[in-house]
UniProtKB/Swiss-Prot annotation:
Domain Ubiquitin-like residue range list: 3-78, 79-154, 155-237, 238-318, 319-392, 393-468, 469-551, 552-627
Keyword terms, alphabetized: Cytoplasm, Isopeptide bond, Nucleus, Repeat, Ubl conjugation pathway
Record-given protein name: Polyubiquitin 8
Keyword Transmembrane helix: no
Single GO biological process annotation from the record: ubiquitin-dependent protein catabolic process
Keyword Lipoprotein: no
Pfam families per record: ubiquitin
Gene3D superfamilies for the chain: Phosphatidylinositol 3-kinase Catalytic Subunit, Chain A, domain 1 (3.10.20.90)
Gene responsible for this protein: UBQ8
Residue location of crosslink Glycyl lysine isopeptide (Gly-Lys) (interchain with K-? in acceptor proteins): 78, 154, 551
SUPFAM superfamilies: Ubiquitin-like (SSF54236)
Compartments, record wording: Cytoplasm; Nucleus
Role, per record: Ubiquitin exists either covalently attached to another protein, or free (unanchored). When covalently bound, it is conjugated to target proteins via an isopeptide bond either as a monomer (monoubiquitin), a polymer linked via different Lys residues of the ubiquitin (polyubiquitin chains) or a linear polymer linked via the initiator Met of the ubiquitin (linear polyubiquitin chains).
Miscellaneous field: Ubiquitin is encoded by 16 different genes. Ubiquitin is generally synthesized as a polyubiquitin precursor with tandem head to tail repeats. Often, there is one to three additional amino acids after the last repeat, removed in the mature protein. Alternatively, ubiquitin extension protein is synthesized as a single copy of ubiquitin fused to a ribosomal protein (either eL40 or eS31) or to a ubiquitin-related protein (either RUB1 or RUB2). Following translation, extension protein is cleaved from ubiquitin.
Length: 631
């Protein structure tokens, strides 16, 4: 059922919207964008003093007929965050949500002189990765990050062995860095004592140090002159006990299992299934009060010879939950409380077809992203709970030779992080990559969403050529009134802009910049683009047309229907045109967006570059200039 609601801006303007209560907040923002031209990412909607989340519906917030929402605009500018050091010092930074963690570290270096490679940034207990953005981690205005320093100089640590091992000394001294991984340290011990890493157990302050996840000495708080204890892993078999809890449906006697410390929990479950015919998916193992994860080893949990595990049977008791997409679609699923999030994603895939694939799905419950290895019960998800589905996407990158690579991304990924993914696949450093989409070059700090790059879009990848090349320009030189066709040779680089090329032409044959129009492959070349953008290579020929001087009339049409008549020249830049509009209408250039044939016009480009002729009509859209208010 359609209802009418209102969105009120801080300037007291009221926007009337026709909606359904099942519409998501994201859909409502899209309706506002269609009506007012305000981009989705600049909108904040407030109801009853609460900011509304994109993935939830109007009904979720009890928004009914003739309710009024308040629309607050997000400024494109930055925000302030805080970085706190371990000494208690707080650093204030001006950032944007699209800034990468690398950018933030560079800002810290500018303020404090700390090299980025010495910095580790922590937020909500999680270490932040360089290629990701602040938005990826939901870091908002006035959030606090924690800065931990990696010591770049070497340090000394001691490794003490238990009695019974005939080392050359009871204590080893190792030269290490705080950024060394546990795996590195074990390799150093192997170099000194010949003891294989998989035979070593390192202990610090009663905690075993594991090689999983590339943990470092700094991660475990190990500093200069700290002492680790080294114990040996016995490679022979050992016996452990598995005890049934009283309420299990499998009430047979307790079990003895022959295992190795390197066995995973899944291996142990498989042994139980072989021995007692207990299906693997119907039981969980507990040790020291903690559920054991399938991919971890017995050694990880410090399970040793004679240890006792407890077996808990998981009864089948199906329930129904709902998964809601951003397009308002609701998917009903029959699940068990011990189904993993990975299982749930597979069910979504089965119901919805090939897409969305599990690896492209993000499931959200109570504002928290759910991890694949955890169960519904771990998140207290019960009968008729609603999860929210946010989709990642696959995009394609086409290389110059025709090869296509596939990337898994989020629309919030920056172009810089996409280049890092490409480097992982093809080995090309990001600073040598140029990515194009719909003919435009993508800027590192912007996101895929900023460029409206969607699932299965194709980007084109070119590489910076580091050396010069020769191209030809077929041009006109003038003697009196008679034009003479002439071909000139230019020394250029693929990174040269079209404006640079025009300057070289002016130096060679004297044709003024504002009277040159360059064409390649039937396309007019835009001044700010590079030769590489147009795939102009060694030996290519560009055609130069001579622009005659002389005025012309064009029309500027506003969204209110008003038409403005301007006297211009084809050599006028878009910035010049905006100034003429300011003189006529008093509208500042930075509040103007000019559109021609659906394309936004760039300030530094000329009317001639866009093939705008006499009596052409441009459309004028005003940029809203709002203050930002925070509740």
């Amino acid at each position: 059922m359609t209802i009418q609601i209102y969105a009120k801006t801080l300037t007291e303007k009221t926007i009337t919207l026709d909606v359904e209560t099942s519409d998501s907040i994201h859909n409502v923002k899209a309706k506002i964008q269609n009506k007012e031209g305000i981009p989705l990412d600049q909108q904040r909607l407030i109801f009853a003093g609460k900011q509304l989340e994109d993935g939830l519906t109007l009904a979720d917030y009890n928004i009914q007929k003739e309710s009024t929402l308040h629309l607050v605009l997000r400024l494109r500018g930055g925000m302030q965050i805080f970085v706190q050091t371990l000494t208690g010092k707080t650093i204030t930074l001006e950032v944007k949500s699209s800034d990468t963690i690398d950018n933030v570290k560079a800002k810290i270096q500018d303020k404090e002189g700390i090299l980025p490679r010495q910095q580790r940034l922590i937020f909500a207990g999680k270490q932040l990765e360089d290629g990701r953005t602040l938005a990826d981690y939901n870091i908002q205005k006035e959030s606090t990050l924690h800065l931990v320093l990696r010591l770049c100089g070497g340090m000394q640590i001691f490794v003490s062995t238990f009695s019974g091992k005939n080392f050359t000394s009871d204590t080893l001294t190792l030269k290490v860095e705080s950024s060394d991984t546990i795996e590195n340290v074990k390799a150093k011990i192997q170099d000194r004592e010949g003891l294989r890493p998989d035979h070593q157990r390192l202990i610090f302050h009663g905690e075993e140090l594991f090689t999983e996840d590339n943990r470092t000495l700094a991660d475990y708080g190990i500093r200069n002159r700290s002492t680790l204890c080294l114990a040996l892993r016995l490679r022979g078999d050992m016996y452990i006990f598995v005890k049934n809890l009283p309420y299990n449906s499998f009430t047979g006697e307790n079990f003895i299992l022959e295992v190795e410390s390197s066995d995973t929990i899944d291996n142990v479950k498989a042994k139980l299934q072989d021995k007692e015919r207990i299906p693997m998916d119907l039981h969980r193992l507990i040790f020291a009060g903690k559920p054991l994860e399938g991919g971890r080893t017995l050694a990880h949990y410090n399970i040793q010879k004679g240890s006792t595990l407890y077996l808990v049977t998981r009864f089948r008791c199906g329930m129904q939950i709902f998964v809601k997409t951003l397009t308002r679609k609701r998917i009903n699923l029959e699940v068990e409380s011990w189904d993993t999030i990975e299982n749930v994603k597979a069910m979504v895939q089965d119901k919805e077809g090939i897409q969305p694939q599990p690896n492209l799905q993000r499931l959200i419950f109570l504002g928290k992203e759910l991890k694949d290895g955890c169960t519904l019960a771990d998140y207290s998800i019960q009968k008729e709970s609603t999860l929210h589905l946010v989709l990642g996407m696959q995009i394609f990158v086409k290389l110059f030779g025709g090869k296509i690579i596939t990337l898994e991304v989020l629309s919030s990924d920056t172009i810089k992080s996409v280049k890092a993914k490409i480097q992982d696949k093809v080995g090309s450093p990001p600073d040598q990559q140029i990515l194009l989409f719909r003919g435009g070059q993508l800027q590192d700090g912007r996101t895929l969403g900023d460029y409206n790059i969607r699932n299965e879009s194709t980007l084109h990848l070119f590489f910076h050529i580091r050396h010069g090349m020769q191209i030809f320009v077929k041009t006109f030189s003038f003697s009196g009134e008679t034009p003479t066709c002439k071909t000139i040779t230019l020394e250029v680089e693929s990174s040269d802009t079209i404006d640079n090329v025009k300057v070289k032409i002016q130096h060679k044959v004297g044709i003024p910049l504002d009277r040159q129009r360059l064409i390649f492959g039937g396309r007019v070349l835009v001044g700010s683009r590079t030769l590489l953008d147009y795939n102009i290579q060694k030996g290519s020929t560009i055609h130069q047309l001579f622009l005659q001087r002389g005025g012309m009339q064009i029309f500027i049409k506003t969204l209110t229907g008003k038409t403005i008549i301007l006297e211009v020249e084809s050599s006028d830049t878009i910035a010049n045109v905006k100034e003429k509009i300011q003189v006529k209408e008093g509208i500042k250039p930075d509040q103007q967006m000019l559109i021609f044939f659906g394309q936004q016009l760039e300030d530094g480009v000329t009317l001639g570059d866009y093939d705008i002729h006499k009596k052409s009509t441009l459309y004028l859209v005003l940029r809203l200039r709002q203050r930002r208010y925070d509740f």
